[in-house]
Amino acid sequence: MNRWTNSMKRCIYFASVYVFLFVTAARCLAQSTMEPWLTRSTDNSRSGWNQHETQLSQASVRSRGIARTTIIPLVGDARGMEAQPLILPNVQTPRGLRDVMVLPSMANVVRGVDAHDGSAIWQAALGTPIDSSATIDSKNINQHWGCISTGVIDPDTRRLYQVCWVSTDNSGKPDPKTAHYFMNVLDVADGHAVVAPVLIQGTSDGQDFNAQMRKQRSSLVETTADGVKTIFGCAGTIFETGSGAAGFCFAFDVASNKQSAILALTAGEGAGVWMAGQGLVADPQGSLYLVTGNGDFDGKTQWGESFLKLKYTPASGGSAATLKVVDHWTPWTDLVRTGQQRASAMKVAGASAPSEAIRTPVNGGMNVSLKNARLESTVSDRGQPVLLVFPDMASGNWSDEDWGSAGPACIFAIGVCVAAGKDGIGYPIKMADLGGTTVADLANPPANCKKLAAPPVWLTMSPGPVDPCPADPRTLNFFPNGDTAHLHMTPVQFHDPLLKSWTIFVWGENAQLHKWAVDQNGRLTYLAQSHEYASADVRGESPGGMPGGFCSGSSNGDDPNSAILACTIPYGDANSSVVNGRLLVYDPVHLAADGSLNVLWDSQRFAVQFLFNKFDPPVIDGGRIYVPNYNGGVDLYELTP
């Protein structure tokens, strides 16, 4: 009996060892399928496309479907996170070799979790966040304001760089004297601080970064400039007008762990950088690209409503590092959009400073009434009737047409960036020569548009025969069918192997998902759209809902059958309140019989409930789709067995 028992024990022992080794091997095999997701939208071009996805495909999603297998919790904030999750595979942690997902919450608590199942690895608290109030967010969507932007991971050093807004006196009050932004440098393996938090600070063009409350929503980017590894970030302000209300960009030197340069983007007011959370684009040569929002423009030191190219020069010898605007292109100014001054009469100094200052936080939105509105009937390019609504409202509202409401799609292979904002107009811009718009150029907008790589187009919707680059920019002051057409998602880039052409996907407010071809010269050609609408529950209730959809894509190289596109949209107006969301997975290559984009999976069909995160696109990696929600966590979707 004892011999039989000992024999059984040995069998059980060896079986346990076998199971352990099998599970460990399976985990390592699974880990090898994960791709690094080191920055928002996967790469420095902000393509939003993972080209190395081997498990999710049109066939696997269509035949097996996906299911939400867990919700990974964030810590300390009811809404969870505004940053996009980041992933660094194959990290040796105190809990073994793991694919680490980094999740910074708005409560300034960063979690490192296993990307496969969300299990905890480490947690780091980075200081007291700022409590939400109408001073910061007129809608009070968020509970706290802490780690707002997406950080960046350096794969060589396994370090996370994350900027967070901290109440240095622990009061949580939005006071510029005590509420400051700090760069945190954490080891991705265990979350420990590599150095003490570094204060973001400095003056530029007479503007003091810490004299006003900034909103550092724009994500970070790491690149090599003149051989020097550097992190860059940008910010806007809580209030866009008034003394000191300027956008800023800053540089952080990786080797020294010190801030090395700072640049105010206007000597006047505005020119904030937010791009709905997107970060700067960094090309292989180290040049940086961004789009600013509302504010002054003079083409010299005031860069509101502009597409900018920045050049960073590292410190050398006795010379300090510098960050400068080296080129730009500007479509119009706030002052002209409000009709307060003709372009031909603009003064160079403070050229577009709006006389009707917008004193509400930057997410205030538009209050549109159809009373006394002027109506024009047109027919869209797709043959559908469109009613153009020109609201009878204070002209100052039209100084809130943020061109920088979305990040640009910069397709390095053809040297073109497509930038679009709240008008929903896509402007193809030559990266090698942006155009250098002057105040005089703005007196003749059609001539200014000739500097573009190709003519602009209505990207998020079609209002019919309306010139997207008119002689009088005030003719753009309308809402199609009474709803806004803003773009907030950065267009997703995909080289379609069947078309043998670059394509982009955009999802504007109160509209459908659109697919466009981009040729070698930057010319945009409409291809298809979905049947599904963003903010479907409030379309037609002027001004409709915000912010449109957010998407990410994946494929296994150039295999056209492997490509999928995952998008989230709100049912209601996610700017004014917390609303339910919808997750859709599309076939981005093969169109349906009616020419529309094919839906492979729809959360609505399976009654999957989640609260929509209004600035965060999904992450597709390793056979999983991660969807940050406003329930305080991240939904993890996987293929069903």
Predicted regions and their residues:
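Bacterial N-terminal signal peptides
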Residues: A15-R27
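An edge-strand/N-cap motif at the start of beta-rich repeat modules
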Residues: Q31-H52
